[in-house]
Amino acid sequence: MLVYLAEYLTQFYSGFNVFSYVTFRAILGLLTALIFSLWWGPKMIERLQMLQIGQVVRNDGPESHFSKRGTPTMGGILILAGVFISVLLWGDLASRYVWVVLFVLASFGLIGFIDDYRKVVRKDTKGLIAKWKYILQSLAALVIAFYLYASADLVGETQLVVPFFKDIMPQLGGFFIVLAYFTIVGSSNAVNLTDGLDGLAIMPTVMVAAAFALIAYLSGHVQFANYLHLPYLPGAGELVIVCTAIVGAGLGFLWFNTYPAQVFMGDVGSLALGAALGVIAVLVRQEILLVIMGGVFVMETVSVILQVGSYKLRGQRIFRMAPIHHHYELKGWPEPRVIVRFWIISLFLVLLGLATLKLR
């Protein structure tokens, strides 16, 4: 929004032209979201405590988690508010890239909010019924998938980028809708499954978002895109502001979510952030790269699938408990050790993913 004001003021003072640079606005976007989260965080935590909106803890979970019962949750609202304020201030609101991500954040955030509300306010431990949660997620994802496919007017917007192979970029056609759908819904639920320990989900989310900020910048710059054999996507640079806003809001939230957590993000945060990473990957045509960089999310999801499948087919469990972070807790690892080691794995995978941009 402020970019338009700066554009108008440029005629009076050329220094305002600096706001036309994506990198400058991205830095301001990160700082805005970070400062907002740090400033508003204590007030929100206090408000959640007053409303008695506390975490519901599974009785069959690790005993160390029983002490978390009652910790304020739904803190994802803080993250989403920081992202929205930052993007609306510093983003180019004429960009469809911006509005696509904001729609996904809002729609999946609303689904998560309903789920959290039923759990912590209505005291319904099941929350939103899984069937309805999946239906609502599917509707939101399909709306975006069909919109992106129908509005695609460049070849690169529906190509699939295959890491390590610069000359393999198949045209997806209608399969684009299927891939976009599963990427958005899958990423949303994967981050949700990962959000089981203090700070475990938010830090990998920040890392992946930071990596996508770089990729979006490169994809929106014709010379860099051609040099790295990426699809050139005019206007994709505006996604940099969205990604850095997620980074800033996420780091601000981590200040209060780090062990021992003062607040949890809840489904309102995890479902929305996961879906946002998914749709950003779709927009910059890096769905496969998301699997690599978001490997921690993939690992958590696969552990649940294997656990459920093994129990139903063989009557035996592979892990002591799923998702896999609980397995290591039950093996005796202290919670901070599990968290930091998963962060290290995430950092390695993000760097590996970025390396594939050149290793092709």
Swiss-Prot record:
Spans traversing the lipid bilayer: 21-41, 74-94, 97-117, 135-155, 168-188, 199-219, 236-256, 263-283, 288-308, 338-358
A GO CC term assigned to this protein in UniProt: plasma membrane
Main location per the UniProt record: membrane
Localization per Swiss-Prot or TrEMBL: Cell inner membrane
EC number in record: 2.7.8.13
Catalytic activity: UDP-N-acetyl-alpha-D-muramoyl-L-alanyl-gamma-D-glutamyl-meso-2,6-diaminopimeloyl-D-alanyl-D-alanine + di-trans,octa-cis-undecaprenyl phosphate = di-trans,octa-cis-undecaprenyl diphospho-N-acetyl-alpha-D-muramoyl-L-alanyl-D-glutamyl-meso-2,6-diaminopimeloyl-D-alanyl-D-alanine + UMP
InterPro entries associated with the record: Glycosyl_transferase_4, PNAcMuramoyl-5peptid_Trfase, PNAcMuramoyl-5peptid_Trfase_CS
Membrane topology: Multi-pass membrane protein
Protein origin, superkingdom: Bacteria
GO biological process: cell division; cell wall organization; peptidoglycan biosynthetic process; regulation of cell shape
Classification via CDD domains: GT_MraY (cd06852)
Record's keyword terms, sorted: Cell cycle, Cell division, Cell inner membrane, Cell membrane, Cell shape, Cell wall biogenesis/degradation, Magnesium, Membrane, Metal-binding, Peptidoglycan synthesis, Transferase, Transmembrane, Transmembrane helix
Cofactor(s) named in the record: Mg(2+)
PROSITE patterns tied to this protein: MRAY_1 (PS01347), MRAY_2 (PS01348)
Pathway: Cell wall biogenesis; peptidoglycan biosynthesis
Protein family (similarity comment): Belongs to the glycosyltransferase 4 family. MraY subfamily.
Function: Catalyzes the initial step of the lipid cycle reactions in the biosynthesis of the cell wall peptidoglycan: transfers peptidoglycan precursor phospho-MurNAc-pentapeptide from UDP-MurNAc-pentapeptide onto the lipid carrier undecaprenyl phosphate, yielding undecaprenyl-pyrophosphoryl-MurNAc-pentapeptide, known as lipid I.
The protein's name: Phospho-N-acetylmuramoyl-pentapeptide-transferase
UniProt source species: Shewanella sediminis (strain HAW-EB3)
Gene name for this UniProt entry: mraY
